[in-house]
Regions:
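Beta-strand-turn-beta hairpins that frame and shape the catalytic cleft
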Residues: 1-4, 121-131
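Core catalytic region of metal-dependent phosphoesterases/phosphodiesterases
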Residues: 2, 9, 13-121
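Anionic group-transfer/hydrolysis microenvironments
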Residues: 10, 135, 155
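Proline-rich low-complexity regions
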Residues: 56-57, 133, 154
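Extended hydrophobic/Leu-rich segments
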Residues: 70, 129, 149-150
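Short beta->alpha connector loops
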Residues: 133-139
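Short amphipathic alpha-helix with an adjacent loop that forms part of the alpha/beta core around
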Residues: 140-148
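Single conserved hydrophobic/aromatic residue that forms the stacking wall/gate
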Residues: 149-159
């Protein structure tokens, strides 16, 4: 299984600069998406800070983020995972409210993309991964405990 890794994309960077937005768009359309197709990569993991501003998002940026990135990944059949980063949450002490949940959450509990606001283990294609989002007061103990399990028993998944 091949996986593409992205991080710190900061959609809306530089005060929602449209010049930066166009630059990012060229990267995704001319390099990233063709690379996924050419190399038959079906899974993408984003390591956090998918958006730039902690408190709000510009509607133009949001529209382009959804149409040029999220919906394109979905249309390509990409299994997309997002680990919540510090720029993805408005509060420093909790991940409970986060950009991905607010933008893409549904009442039915189905999510695209999949996002992780708490530390947890997942298995992708037979490979175990420990995902740890932005660590803060509300998840510090659980994140530390999961990390210590993997340090003491690196081949064991936490239950």
């Amino acid at each position: 299984m091949r996986v593409a890794i992205l991080n710190d994309t900061h959609w809306g960077a530089r005060n929602d600069s449209l010049a930066f937005l166009e630059y990012f768009h060229k990267f995704y359309d001319n390099i990233f998406f063709p690379y996924l197709e050419k190399n038959n990569i079906r899974t993408v993991i984003h390591l956090g800070d998918i958006v730039d501003r902690r408190k709000f998002i510009n509607y133009i940026i949001l529209n382009r983020f959804k149409t040029d990135f999220i919906y394109k990944l979905k249309k390509m059949g990409i299994d997309f995972h997002v680990i919540i980063g510090n720029h993805d949450v408005p509060y420093r002490n909790t991940n409970k409210i986060n950009a991905m949940q607010e933008l893409f959450g549904t009442d039915s509990g189905t999510w695209y993309p999949k996002f992780y606001s708490e530390a947890r283990d997942i298995n992708l294609g037979g490979t175990d991964l420990c995902l740890i989002p932005w660590i803060n007061n509300s998840n510090y103990t659980a994140s530390l405990q999961l990390s210590l399990i993997h340090i003491s028993e690196p081949t064991r998944l936490a239950t």
